[in-house]
Curated annotation (Swiss-Prot):
Annotated site residue numbers, Cleavage: K437, T438
Protein name: Readthrough protein P3-RTD
Pro residues: compositionally biased ranges: 209-221, 536-545
Organism for this UniProt entry: Turnip yellows virus (isolate FL-1) (TuYV)
Domain of life from the UniProt record: Viruses
Lineage of the species this protein comes from: Viruses, Riboviria, Orthornavirae, Pisuviricota, Pisoniviricetes
Residue ranges of the region described as Disordered: 1-64, 203-223, 431-553, 609-629, 641-670
Length: 670
């Protein structure tokens, strides 16, 4: 049996045998990471039947990038340097972008191209120099140049720019320096292309999200409320007086009742007061004013007038006279630092008003330079420096001598209330940037006394605590031991003690002031119910005081004239003032004449004894003939003699003295 095997023939050719495909070995794939955040993730290939499960090997990842940037607005005279590396601020994509994603980098090529923007009429060039190691700070060679009127181009390969080695991303690779020699007009710009390779990537934080929107506008700060404070009141003190021929005695100053106004609200407050300084002739009042924390412009208006009034019924609080001021230009209204304040821009103007020589008050005339009023206007800037801040105000001195005493005579020592004057103090916080002095016209009838820019120093501790002083008074003045009154021992007949005497050391600038101090035990409250009756200090022995001996007799003219009336040159200070007014002279002319009068009074001491044969008898100066006559008078006769001399003149007083010594009755003529 024949077997026929048929072979399939297609297109005349025998069908090829089916062959099994050989499994192909997969080729290794290199995975390269780039900095493109939007790179599409490669699609995963399906695993074939014959594919092995081996891992695809990879090499160290890297990247190569090209950056193009420009340096614009180059003038023909521009100079500078372009540093390639992390300092390349002209290309943030390179310095703040790619360098932060890798550990190492190298720039393999740089193309420096000059783009001209100058006109054909301009001249000059821009020289450039390559510094491959970043060691130059300025251009050192001008071999390579670009003309500013035409473009230019220069390329540097890796070997020129230190680009064959890898560099840490924290260090710069090279630098190009340039400098032009043209004008200051715009010449063109640099267009720079760099090719850079990056090596060894590192983890970088994701890009920060969008910045938050603008914060809501803050609420407006509430406007500061400035304060305005006013103190206003009339300080008072208690005095003791007998007649207009005697000196007065002063008690310690009580606390003063002032009206306090703030933000249109009014109440009452007490201000501490005391004598700033005190001696046998005068005492200076002082009032302490508290200041709230802050900076203040302070304005003070002061009207000094010292009326006296009775303290008992039926004429209680009715004026019965006054205590006059002197015309000393060195005294007046002023302020000083008391505690935790700074005072600047101080300006104080003081004025005074003389009494007319023909005016008579309680039988006395104003013919010795007495003043009725002493006013002042003051502005300053005060800044507090701590808690319990305060400053003080001082006024003109209260004169104790009989020539300034115009209180009514009762024939016995009587207490009276005396006003210091009206004081208004305004503290303005809104004007705290500084005090501006407003020039004010002086009051009609007032004479300008003095303007000062200096503040008063804080008194010594003893001065601010009270006083027990000794004062020379008239022969009728009784000795007192409390309330700050004044005493002085005199010889029989009203003559002073010998020149050599022991007195306490003084405190302060005035050798007659601040003889001793003592703090009052209680302050007196001022109120309508109290009736202004301060409590007197209990009597007691004075404390021992340090003493010193004065051997140099150098008194003031007023003191010499009070002790020895015979040295009067024949005219008074009031006569000088009247003559100056009649002649139309100035205050300066009047003061010069008064100085001449004072010199004549002091020169009158020469008549107390011969200049060649002067001697001391019993420790005192030898009295003149007239003084010996006056020593023979009784106390009442001497007081009457002084009153006649003050009211009618020295001639009438001498006639009265002679009639007394002759044994005649002078009542019919005097």
């Amino acid at each position: 049996m024949n077997t026929v095997v048929g072979r399939r023939i297609i297109n005349g050719r025998r069908r090829p045998r089916r062959q099994t495909r050989r499994a192909q070995r997969p080729q290794p794939v290199v995975v390269v990471q780039t900095s493109r955040a939007t790179q599409r993730r490669p699609r995963r290939r399906r695993r074939g039947n014959n594919r092995t499960g081996r891992t695809v090997p990879t090499r160290g990842a890297g990247s190569s990038e090209t950056f193009v940037f420009s340096k614009d607005n180059l003038a023909g005279s521009s100079s500078g340097a372009i540093t390639f590396g992390p300092s390349l601020s002209d290309c943030p994509a390179f310095s703040n972008g790619m360098l932060k994603a890798y550990h190492e980098y190298k720039i393999s090529m740089v193309i420096l191209e000059f783009v001209s923007e100058a006109s054909s009429q301009n001249s000059g060039s821009i020289a450039y120099e390559l510094d491959p190691h970043c060691k130059l700070n300025s251009l050192s060679s001008t071999i390579n140049k670009f003309g500013i009127t035409k473009p230019g181009k220069r390329a540097f390969t890796a070997s020129y720019i230190n680009g064959t080695e890898w560099h840490d991303v924290a260090e710069d690779q090279f630098r190009i320096l340039y400098k032009g020699n043209g004008s200051s007009s715009i010449a063109g710009s640099f267009r720079i292309t760099i090719k850079c390779q990056f090596h060894n990537p590192k983890y970088v934080d994701e890009e920060p999200g969008p910045s938050p929107g603008p914060s809501p506008s803050p609420q407006p700060t509430p406007q500061k409320k400035y304060r305005f404070i006013v103190y206003t009141g009339v300080p008072v003190t208690r005095i003791m007086a007998q007649s207009t021929d005697d000196a007065i005695s002063l008690y310690d100053m009580p606390s003063q009742r002032f009206r306090y106004i703030e933000d249109e609200n009014m109440n009452w407050t007490n201000l501490d007061s005391r004598w700033y300084s005190q001696n046998s002739l005068k005492a200076i009042p002082m009032i302490i004013v508290p200041v709230p924390q802050g900076e203040w412009t302070v304005e003070i208006s002061m009207e000094g007038y010292q009326p006296t009034s009775s303290t008992t019924d039926p004429n209680k609080d009715k004026q019965d006279g006054l205590i006059a001021y002197n015309d000393d230009l060195s005294e007046g209204w002023n302020v000083g630092i008391y505690n935790n304040v700074e005072i600047t821009n101080n300006k104080a103007d003081n004025t005074l008003k003389y009494g007319h020589p023909d005016m008579e008050l309680n039988g006395c005339h104003f013919n010795q330079g007495q003043c009725l009023e002493r006013d002042g206007d003051l502005t300053c800037h005060i800044k507090t420096t701590g808690d319990n801040a305060s400053f003080f105000v001082v006024g003109p001195a209260v004169q104790k001598q009989s020539k300034y005493n115009y209180a009514v005579s009762y024939g016995a020592w009587t207490d009276r209330m005396m006003e210091i004057g009206m004081i208004a103090i305004a503290l303005d916080e809104q004007g705290s940037s500084g005090s501006v002095k407003t020039e004010r016209p002086k009051r009609v009838g007032h004479s300008m006394a003095v303007s000062t820019w200096e503040t008063i120093k804080l008194p010594e501790k003893g001065n601010s605590e009270g006083y027990e002083t000794s004062q020379r008074q008239d022969s009728k003045t009784p000795p007192t031991a409390s309330g700050g009154s004044d005493t002085l021992d005199v010889e029989e007949g009203g003559l002073p003690l010998p020149v050599e005497e022991e007195i306490p050391d003084f405190v302060g600038d005035n050798p007659w002031s601040d003889l001793s101090t003592k703090n009052s035990q209680e302050e007196e409250a001022m109120s309508s119910e109290s009736g202004l009756r301060p409590q007197l200090k209990p009597p007691g022995l004075p404390k021992p005081q340090p003493i010193r001996t004065i051997r140099n007799f150098d008194p003031t003219p007023d003191l010499v004239e009070a002790w020895r009336p015979d040295v009067n040159p024949g005219y008074s200070k009031a006569d000088v003032a009247a003559a100056t007014i009649i002649a139309g002279g100035s205050i300066k002319d009047g003061r010069s004449m008064i100085d001449k009068r004072n010199k004549a009074v002091l020169d009158g001491r020469k008549s107390w004894g011969s200049s060649l044969a002067s001697s001391l008898t019993g420790g005192t100066l030898k009295a003149s003939a007239k003084s010996e006559k006056l020593a023979k008078l009784t106390t009442s006769e001497r007081a009457r003699y002084e009153r006649i001399k003050r009211q009618q003149g020295s001639t009438r007083a001498s006639e009265f003295l002679e009639s007394l010594l002759a044994g005649e009755d002078p009542d019919s003529r005097f």
